[in-house]
Structure formats: structure tokens, C-alpha cells
Amino acid sequence: MYKINPNDLNLTDKVVHISRVAKVVKGGRRFSFSALVVVGDGNGCVGYGLGKANEVPEAIRKGVEQAKKNLIKVPIVEGHTIPYEVLGHFGAGRVLIKPASAGTGVIAGGAARAVFEAAGLHNVLSKCLGSNNPHNVVKAAFNGLAQLRSPEEIMARRGVTE
């Protein structure tokens, strides 16, 4: 898969999950934050990143920078959905993603919905199977979207002209 230059795209970011973690030290608890962020151009390019810092805005900024380094291209058919059904895996999390007819909308749970909206998918059905942890769901959704190939790409690979 080729590298996508984030500077050429008009990316929007969406915070999926913010987590506060504590390190226990002699004087008490030391708090830190991690932010799971999804970025996308709404036209087939989408990425995710995890930022960690002592303050929330800094964690989000780091997450966005990480997400820009992790962009994938999603094939969108008929201007609104994916070409075929796919199952993405990550850890114990699995996400089933199905194409939907026009007017259906994005039917997905919180973390997966953010990924599909950032990618520019307007009609898609999805179901989280197994783990509902936002990190696993986002990574499983990405795994599923990364497996997708456009109909033209599949025809070229098989040597079919029409």
C-alpha cells in the first residue's frame, strides 16, 4: 500500500476516547491522559492515532499527529458505501462491516461510527463482535477497511476486462 501525504488532504479529526490513567508515587497519584483520535478527509482517506500526555489537549494533538502517519485509502463505490462485506479483527475485537443501500445511513457503534464518518462512508451497517473496547473496535474497523479492494483493482488482478 502506498504512502498517503497528509499535507495534500483537508483532514478533520474526531476524538473517539479519552482515558485518564494514574501512576501511584510516594506523594500520591500522578495523572496522565491518553486520547484515541480518528482523522479523515471524508473522501476515502482515514487514519487513527493514540496520543499520551499530562494534559488532554496535548494528548489529542499527539494523537492527531500519529493518525496522520497512519492513513489508509478506502474504496467507496456508488459514492456512499463499501464494495462488499468484510470482517475486521484486532485482538478480541471483531467488526463486521456490510454495504448498505442509499438512505440507510451509518449504523454503527460509537468507536466504529467515528471511523466510517471520517472515511466518508454514508451508508454502511456494522456490528461489533467480541470486545467493545474502543481501541480494539477502531483497530478492527481499520483492519476490515484495509482489506477492501475496489472492483477495478480486483478485475485487474484477475485479468478480467469486463
Swiss-Prot record:
One of its GO terms (molecular function) is rRNA binding. Gene3D superfamilies: 3.30.160.20, 3.30.230.10. The keyword Phosphoprotein does not apply. InterPro entries: Ribosomal_Su5_D2-typ_SF, Ribosomal_uS5, Ribosomal_uS5_bac-type, Ribosomal_uS5_C, Ribosomal_uS5_N, Ribosomal_uS5_N_CS, Ribsml_uS5_D2-typ_fold_subgr. The keyword Ribosomal protein applies. It comes from the Bacteria. Pfam families: Ribosomal_S5 (PF00333), Ribosomal_S5_C (PF03719). GO terms for biological process: translation. Residues 11-74 form the S5 DRBM domain. One of its GO terms (cellular component) is cytosolic small ribosomal subunit. Keywords: Ribonucleoprotein, Ribosomal protein, RNA-binding, rRNA-binding. With S4 and S12 plays an important role in translational accuracy. Located at the back of the 30S subunit body where it stabilizes the conformation of the head with respect to the body. The N-terminal domain interacts with the head of the 30S subunit; the C-terminal domain interacts with the body and contacts protein S4. The interaction surface between S4 and S5 is involved in control of translational fidelity. NCBIfam families: rpsE_bact. Belongs to the universal ribosomal protein uS5 family. Part of the 30S ribosomal subunit. Contacts proteins S4 and S8. This is Small ribosomal subunit protein uS5. It comes from Geobacter sulfurreducens (strain ATCC 51573 / DSM 12127 / PCA). The lineage of its organism: Bacteria, Pseudomonadati, Thermodesulfobacteriota, Desulfuromonadia, Geobacterales.
